[in-house]
Amino acid sequence: MLYETKTSHNCETVMEKAKDFFNGEWGLEVSSKEDCCALFQGGGGHVFIQCIKDEDKLKVELATREWDRQVKKFMRKV
């Protein structure tokens, strides 16, 4: 499933929050991480998160399999 939200945070902050949330709280492994994106895997699924500049805010795209509830919770945090 693909999700999208906008935030006033910068990409670095979003990636830190994503690592704390998906790796720290839920135990997903960080499979890859760049400045603008990260892939977390575990529990039979994955979460891919990407930051995209969009006018005055930052667009955050999240693609997931098996972690929809957690992705929705994360979107409320950013």
Residues covered by each model-derived region:
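Terminal, regulation- and interaction-focused segments at domain boundaries
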Residues: 1-30
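Ser/Thr- and Asn-enriched, surface-exposed coil loops between beta-strands
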Residues: 31-37, 56
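Beta-strand/loop substructures that line and gate deep hydrophobic ligand-binding cavities in soluble
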Residues: 41-78
